[in-house]
A protein has these predicted regions:
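Internal helical hairpin/lid segments
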Residues: 227-317
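Flexible, glycine/charged-enriched surface loops at secondary-structure junctions
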Residues: 27-30, 162, 239-248, 274, ...
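Short, conserved secondary-structure transition motifs
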Residues: 168-175, 255-258
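Metallocofactor- and cofactor-centric catalytic cores in central/energy metabolism, strongly enriched
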Residues: 1-130, 144, 152-157, 165, ...
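A conserved active-site cap/scaffold subdomain adjacent to cofactor or substrate pockets
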Residues: 165, 183-249
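A short secondary-structure junction signal
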Residues: 145-149, 176-178, 200-203, 227-229
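Generic beta-sheet signal
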Residues: 89, 115, 136, 165-167, ...
Length: 363
């Protein structure tokens, strides 16, 4: 048996299903913060085996999805500059801006590169000394340490043609913003997995206490998620509001302190605009003033005029937990992974992409 098999074991899944059915006394709304959890929930069809009173609500845990259009347009402007190589991670290239996407811009001849690791920037910079290398850094606490490490190496190696546009965001701030929204009815949270490896699960304890809401930090496998749901239901029955660490094989209370200290060395918190949630206090990170020489937003003109989002797209409501992909009139029709209208259909962690991939709409 492979290590992961025990977390997909059919008998364990059915036993947990039975326990959940026995424990559930009232309808419960559980928001999974992480986009990876959304995909696991849909991939393993967990809603279909759980009581209908168990409702999963999809949260703002996809960094590409929550990136506002103004920042996409800024990326496109930077990538359009002469003598520039624009580098970033993941699905950002396919997110529509006001006019085009970064992928469209690359098709027109711009040097836009999707990286597997931020550290690839070092070789790109050394091989292109006559060009400006812009690293458009995105992601929650999971990817921030790699951006910090890249900056550290750029400084150590005295590389002067690399500039950072920082779009890193934090998990607790948008969760708090959602809980402060009286239109959102959430009884509990599935805490993120990979983020918690870095931050530790202790970071969520103030949220659980403030909003009297159970939080279960969960792994990605079906047994992980069902164990977390069972704990949440038991906490709800008992009237307790604790952070439960189901993902003990990877997450500790303190997290990766070395990575945290590296981030603190180069970054400071700042307000950040999230798609669908608006400007959130302390929701993002920016370079500290002493590293402003590496800040693309200070080195180059980043002012843009962005157009409003398509009225047909409800990504903003989905990210706030007020709607699901099926509520969108263009889902699976005008909006598909091949021709996405909204960011939730673009990203591999987006709720719409998960529904499209694993639900009957694509059968």
């Amino acid at each position: 048996m492979n290590f992961i098999d025990e977390f997909r074991d059919k008998e364990s899944i059915l036993a947990l299903k039975k326990l959940i059915e026995q424990e559930l006394k009232n309808p419960i709304n559980i928001m999974e913060i992480c986009g990876g959890h959304t995909h696991s929930i849909m991939k393993y069809a967990l809603p279909s085996i759980l009581p209908k009173e168990t409702n999963f609500i999809h949260g703002p845990g996809c960094p590409v999805c929550v990136m506002p259009r103004v920042r996409i347009d800024t990326a496109i402007k930077l990538a359009s500059m002469k003598d520039t190589i624009f580098c970033t991670l993941g699905d950002l290239l396919r997110v529509p801006g006001s006019e085009i996407s970064l992928l469209d811009l690359r098709a027109k001849g711009a040097d836009v590169r999707a990286l597997y690791s931020p550290l690839e920037v070092l070789e790109i910079a050394k091989q292109n000394l006559n060009k400006n290398i812009i690293f458009f850094a995105i992601g929650f606490e999971t990817t921030t340490p790699m951006s910090a490490l890249l900056l550290q190496k750029v400084i150590e190696e005295k590389i002067n043609n690399v500039f950072f546009h920082i779009n890193h965001i934090t998990v607790p701030a948008p969760v708090e913003a959602i809980m402060n929204d009286e239109n959102v009815k959430i009884n509990a949270f599935l805490g993120p997995s990979h983020v918690s490896v870095i931050t530790g699960y202790g970071i969520y304890e103030p949220l659980a206490a403030k909003f009297k809401t159970p939080i279960a930090v969960s792994g990605f496998e079906p047994v992980d998620i069902l164990e977390s749901v069972l704990n949440i239901i038991k906490q709800s029955n008992e009237g307790t509001f604790k952070v439960y660490n189901q993902y003990k094989r990877a997450v500790s209370k303190e997290g990766n302190v070395k990575a945290q200290n590296l981030v603190k060395k180069y970054f400071r918190v700042c307000d950040f605009e999230f798609r669908g949630l608006g400007l959130i206090k302390d929701g993002g990170l920016e370079l500290k003033e002493e590293f402003s020489a590496y800040d693309a937003s200070k080195k180059f003109d980043c002012t843009v005029q962005s157009k409003n989002e398509s009225k047909a797209c409800i990504c903003g409501q989905i990210l706030r937990g007020l709607a699901k992909p099926y509520d969108c009139k263009v889902f699976g029709k005008a909006c598909t992974p091949r021709s996405p209208i909204g960011s939730c259909m673009v990203s591999g962690e987006g709720a719409c992409a998960a529904y499209y991939k694993y639900s009957k709409v694509n059968a």
